[in-house]
Amino acid sequence: MPDGGRDTELLIEDEVREPRMFRVLLHNDDYTTMEFVVSILIEVFRRTPDEATRIMLAVHEKGVGECGVYTAEVAETKVALVHARARREGYPLRCTLEEV
């Protein structure tokens, strides 16, 4: 036994899959202020003020805007944070996710 009596090592290839990714979207409504949407984008999604303003305008003009693409757990957490903060502030802001 050339390896000093140790068993021969077996190499096992694990299949590594990329995590499923989800796009997080904000939806326009007639009550949530533009300022609140910008603050959500800055605080929850870590967008710069310029990026947040651009996304907010897309939400306002097109009815929906993309906040970012995240793994499932991160996306779900961000959606929950948006809904909790919006409800606490009295806004009906809707945030959804869709698989990429």
From Swiss-Prot:
Disulfide cysteine pairs (residue numbers): none
One family name in Pfam for this protein: ClpS
Top-level taxon in the UniProt lineage: Bacteria
Gene Ontology BP terms: protein catabolic process; proteolysis
Family to which the UniProt record says this protein belongs: Belongs to the ClpS family.
Function description: Involved in the modulation of the specificity of the ClpAP-mediated ATP-dependent protein degradation.
Listed HAMAP family: ClpS
Subunit structure: Binds to the N-terminal domain of the chaperone ClpA.
The protein's name in its UniProt record: ATP-dependent Clp protease adapter protein ClpS
Organism: Nitratidesulfovibrio vulgaris (strain DSM 19637 / Miyazaki F) (Desulfovibrio vulgaris)
